[in-house]
Amino acid sequence: YHRVEEEDAQAALQAAWDAGLRYFDTAPQYGLGLAEQRVGRAIARFGNTLTLSTKVGRLLKDCAPKDVTPEAFVDVPQKRIVFDYTYDGVMRSYDDSIARLGSDRIDILLLHDIDAGTHGQDGEDRNLRELFSGGGYRALNELREAGRIAAIGAGVNTWQICEKLLGEGAFDCFLLAGRYTLLEQDPLETFLPLCTKRD
């Protein structure tokens, strides 16, 4: 990775828009908040004819330079990541994203990296307890029912956690990174048929 200037980021977002892309995804993790700020400035120009998703599960906390979360991003805000999938964590993450985006509009709110691929199996189990017993899922539902978001889901790197989530709640969509490809077809066995069944 290397430093990306604001004008280069805006030019890339504009090129995507000009090419016809109307779905933009971001997250607090990306650039430790900088990506949401930049996407927010772009969508202010684009208007309401797009779909925007961001993610919950990582809170960004101010910190000393020595405590910045070691990510691969370069020249980003001085923040450390705290994972939190509880009711308060989801609500705080949503509010913080709204502030960084400079807009009250988020269409899809995705649980970010809640799975064992990021946290190990014990961590995944803890995260699911936070989500379903600690109120994180209730927070997502409240936001959806209040019309503050249109859909809830998960942005993850393993399809197995998506199956678990579908077994526990009414999720609308999943952003599955690289787990269904020409070479990796396992999701076809149970996960994608379950998605079809659940509409």
For every predicted segment, state its role.
Residues 1-62:
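N-terminal binding-site loop/beta-alpha segment at the start of enzyme catalytic domains
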Residues 3-16, 86-100, 157-164:
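Short, acidic/polar
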Residues 1-7, 75-91, 125-128:
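Active-site mouth loops of central-metabolism enzymes
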Residues 15-20, 96-105, 139-151, 198:
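A structural motif corresponding to the C-terminal end of an alpha-helix
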Residues 7-10, 29-32, 42, 114-199:
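Beta/alpha (TIM)-barrel catalytic core signal, keyed to glycine-rich beta->alpha loops juxtaposed to Asp/Glu
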Residues 98-123:
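Active-site groove signature of glycoside hydrolases
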Residues 62-81, 117-125, 194-199:
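Glycine-rich, positively charged active-site loop/lid region within alpha/beta enzyme cores that binds
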Residues 22-23, 49-55, 105-110, 149-153, ...:
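Structural preference for beta-strand elements that scaffold enzyme active sites
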